[in-house]
């Protein structure tokens, strides 16, 4: 058998080329004898190999340090050549670092500005309102009752005033529709009777009227569907406010079977979609309770204010008034009528209205009191003439000069 082998010089040439390509150091083999000698140093290899060791000489007593040679694996070898992509990456990183340093340097550099001297002259206005010194903290004694949320109550009422602007009803919103303001007043008067017969909460009635007005403002209907909208709105308000809401069959009965259960359910879906399932508009009662607490009024003044507020839900010309200003005007007029109490700074602070701001609404309320004596829409007046409501609609003070002076 013939064996084919490469020469040593051929193997050496290939190894040198590979070493140059990979950038590793080449070590010469002992078996290579035909390597050319360097003229400047002579044949170092022969001199080393021809050296003789004298056994009579002792070796120096120096410690022998052996250098551990770690052989590189294919995973630890790295190329010494740098590609163009690596250079571009290094340049980008350098640019980013430089830019970040510039931004950081600008951020920490102090801004030098001139500071004006404080004017401490006596003719300048105070830095705080002196009015707050006379305002009583009506929530100071409620901190031990977590249900009264005294820490958040001011923020809650601030948010409620924002909501009443969000869900506001425009004045004369029925203009151009088949349903008129008079038809609306008749419907609300009838719903007051239904509400009283079902023994529902006071909030349910106010929410019913709110749903009706908001729905009719954006969804015109025919007059033969107006009563359907009314009973469906009361059904929705009952589900929202009551613990035990009346059934659909109860509203079918109260309308003398003018509408079916399917009609009420269909209208319920229409109202929900139109109002986007939003029934969070604040009510007059919410603000009245807060104002009555701030004014420390008795039950008679509070009940008279409720009567005045309920007169406004029938009046079409007052649909655009916010619940907060109606509640403030009703309580202020109640205080004026019963004992001529003053609208204090505490009441102005917590109601967010001064007496001057609510005066036009007080005039309108006085007109409604006079109008209720001769109006055919008597549901509210009859309701508040019962002993349950202290017969407040029949008190002689409602015919006093405090009312008549505001009407003129």
From Swiss-Prot:
Keyword annotations of the record: Cell cycle, Cell division, Cyclin, Mitosis
Molecular functions per Gene Ontology: cyclin-dependent protein serine/threonine kinase regulator activity
GO biological process assignments: cell division; mitotic cell cycle phase transition
Pfam families xref list: Cyclin_C, Cyclin_N
Parts of the chain that traverse the membrane: none
UniProt entry tagged with the keyword Calcium: no
Domain of life: Eukaryota
PROSITE patterns: CYCLINS
Alphabetical list of InterPro entries matching this protein: Cyclin (IPR039361), Cyclin-like_dom (IPR013763), Cyclin-like_sf (IPR036915), Cyclin_A/B-like (IPR046965), Cyclin_C-dom (IPR004367), Cyclin_N (IPR006671), Cyclins_cyclin-box (IPR048258)
Sequence similarity: Belongs to the cyclin family. Cyclin AB subfamily.
PANTHER family: CYCLINS
Subunit structure: Interacts with the CDC2 protein kinase to form a serine/threonine kinase holoenzyme complex also known as maturation promoting factor (MPF). The cyclin subunit imparts substrate specificity to the complex.
Function: Essential for the control of the cell cycle at the G2/M (mitosis) transition.
Entry protein name: G2/mitotic-specific cyclin-B
Protein's organism: Patella vulgata (Common limpet)
